[in-house]
Amino acid sequence: MSDHTNPPSAPPDDDPNGGSLLMPVTLEEEMSRSYLDYAMSVIVSRALPDARDGLKPVHRRILYGMQESGYTADKPYRKSARINGDVMGKYHPHGDAAIYDALVRLAQPFSLRVPLIDGQGNFGSMDGDPAAAPRYTEARLARSASFLLNDIDRDTVDFQPNYDDSEMEPRVLPASYPNLLVNGADGIAVGMATKIPTHNPTEVIDATLAMIDNPDITLDELMTVIPGPDFPTGGLILGRSGIRSAFETGKGSITVRARTDFEEVRGGRQAIVISEIPYQVNKATLQERMAELVRAKQIEGISDIRDESDRSGVRVVIELKRDATPDVVLNHLFRFTQLQISYGINMLALDGGQPRLMGLRDVLSTFIRFREDVILRRARFELNKARDRAHLLVGLAIAVANIDEVIRLIRQSPDSTSARIALMERDWPAADVAPLLTLIDDGGNVLTEAQTVRLTEVQARGILELRLQRLTGLERDKIHNEMQEVAARIGELLEIIGSHIRRMEVMREELAVIRAELNSPRRSEINDSLADQDDESLIEPGQMVVTITRDGFIKRTPLDVFRQQHRGGRGRAAASMRGDDIVTRSFNAHTHQWVLFFSSGGKAYRQKVWRLPEAGPTAKGRALVNLLPELGSDGITAVLPLPQDESLWEGLHLVFATASGGIRRNRLSDFKNVRASGLIAMKLDEGDRLIGVATCREGDDIMLASRLGRCIRFQANEDTLRVFAGRESSGVRGMKLAQGDEVISLSVLRHVEATPEERAAYLRYASARRRSAAGEEDQIDAEVMEADDSEVTVDDTALSPERIAGLEEAEEFLLTVTIAGFGKRSSAYDYRVSGRGGQGIANINLAPRNGRAVAATFPVRPGDDVMLVTDAGRLIRVPADQVRITGRSTMGVTLFRVDKDEVVTSVFPVLETESVDDNGDDADSVAPAAPDGQVTDSDD
């Protein structure tokens, strides 16, 4: 039985001398070495381009293979399958698919700035469509490829054996222009990657010429010539900082944006037309992403997307809805789709066989050094060829000059060998060819002091092969002229070889020719002003009326849409209701204001007014759940427009009130960062709900009003209502409620230090003055108004003129509106300040006539307008100054004539509006307003 612990080993492989050929090695060492070999193979032989010609091995082999097979620009197209086979069989044994994919990319005008292959057939599209099979497509080298391959047969670059040593292939192509910059590169190696953008060929050549003229040229000077990448698909490049970083260090990131315009399409609608898309963006995928965002309602305002692209170029039309803001929709498309991309630049290339991160100056200087070496090697090759030709011409010239003697020697020789030897052993006069012999300088023809030379074997063979027609006088002149041309050419080549300056001149001349051939206008615009714009900067500022319905629909409507009417009118439609949906909340805000939304469940959300959907007065709006995620079944019961100037937020507090009479005060900064999904604003007891939120400062007065006509006023200070540190507290009791009652309004009032007697005296004086002005004064009013100038005494309380002026300046008025459309204005001095948690005092005298319930109570200022909205969706705008000022315990006057079973659901002030008198002639008015603008039924 074998030992499982030590199994028998395999017999060792022995060398002829009896020693073992097996070398023990650890697994770690072998894996490390093998992986390193693999990594270097991928880096050097597959993924990274060479900095000299800008090509990866597969691209280089395709171009060289097509050149060797004669598939040049001046020849007919050849089947791609044949090209595939030639390249795979001779140079690149890695599968036909890999070769064909690389060939296709070289032919795509949307992939390369200067395509190197001229393709015929379906070579793919910007929609990501694959190319047709290689048996269907044809190709040949493009004219631009010749500038990479020219002089490859003149010993300009080194060659190496192919994979099976059956062919020789170039290590690099003798590129005549910096193809690495012109066509860029993409590749992922092991542990590294390259991503080099394309550039404008004219600019790249100009930059190369600038560096030739001034090798110490700065990057800033270069960037005036080559300002940045130039993509074949065009587009806009935003800013230059990323470009400079990439040009300086080899790494950087640029923002590329599609080129778009606004057009008017059918029906007078606006459309966004895309004419250029960012580089390497799949157009079909881009449109699919847009459609997904529209279906998910992440982008609003798009009605249709269609692709009208054709051979003339890209054209994608995005039709917008009538209520959409084109700039905002476009900004959302930039933000959420590949209409705008961040293109990361990593200019990694092989320099001397080693990966190197290269900046713009590095790439250009590397190319210039390489190109100078190509020119030098070409000159040496051509010099050798010219000298060989000159060497032969010397022999022919000597033979022609001594033709009789040459013929005699040949005729006397028994055979060609003897004739050749006879020619080589004779001294020939060479005074006429002495200058050329000096240029040849090959040691074959040694000029003696007697100005004679002996012919070499090559020259002797050339003479023997000379045709008789070359012996004519004309042919002798041709030989002489050619000798002069070759001599001049040898002189030029010697100058090129011996002078760096001359080589730079040659390079400059050749680049000028290529520049004229590849001249192309810039396609990608570099825009310094189009930085990332936020949506808000695109929105025109203005006042909006925001309306929220019970079923959770919201809209914003420009304030000037609602024309002002006298109180007592019938109003106009504020929203088109469906079913039994009613308006539950409306408020006035600026488009650029932050608005805090508070749900009945105590959650807070934040949104800018301009982000709310805009709609006309009769439109219903859109569902709030599309704007406020995770709202659930809770309704929005409180909204709070915050000051537009965020510096005013300092020192502001938020006061929360619940239907059960609870209240809490927090710092506004606790709600400065509200996440998209909302956050807990107030912890509520079961069955309770949030009814209002307001901003206040330390020392302000808080007033709660109940549905059954009660109210309470107390001061917001540390003694009465402290600032809570947390958001999840349920707060403290603000008002004690009777059975069946609930808090319906929260107001913040200015705190004024005044005794009860001073408040009562001032109220009596102010009432008397108003009655006197209206011609309604009685005897008591007259007595009050006849007081001397030093002070006013009312009910034994003396008020100085200064005190009256101070109280008048600080006076606020509270408007209370019932569900039946009745309302009144009362001075805030009529509401005494008490402690928190009491039952409060009467706010209004309720009766069946005025509705038995309060809709709202809030402060108004002179000049304010007030809007009342009913559950039927009707709205009226009334100047607050037309509502008579009465005492606290009165029934009010008619503000809004409501129909039977119609109730007022929302009342809010409209500030700083222009008065537009509407006498009831508007088509949207249901009934005319009172002609004199006064109360139609006095219920005081």
UniProtKB/Swiss-Prot annotation:
Keyword Acetylation set for record: no
Protein name: DNA gyrase subunit A
Pfam families according to UniProt: DNA_gyraseA_C, DNA_topoisoIV
Binding partners and assembly: Heterotetramer, composed of two GyrA and two GyrB chains. In the heterotetramer, GyrA contains the active site tyrosine that forms a transient covalent intermediate with DNA, while GyrB binds cofactors and catalyzes ATP hydrolysis.
Signal peptide: none
Domain Topo IIA-type catalytic: start-end pairs: 48-538
NCBIfam families (alphabetical): gyrA (TIGR01063), PRK05560.1 (NF004043), PRK05561.1 (NF004044)
Source organism (scientific name): Granulibacter bethesdensis (strain ATCC BAA-1260 / CGDNIH1)
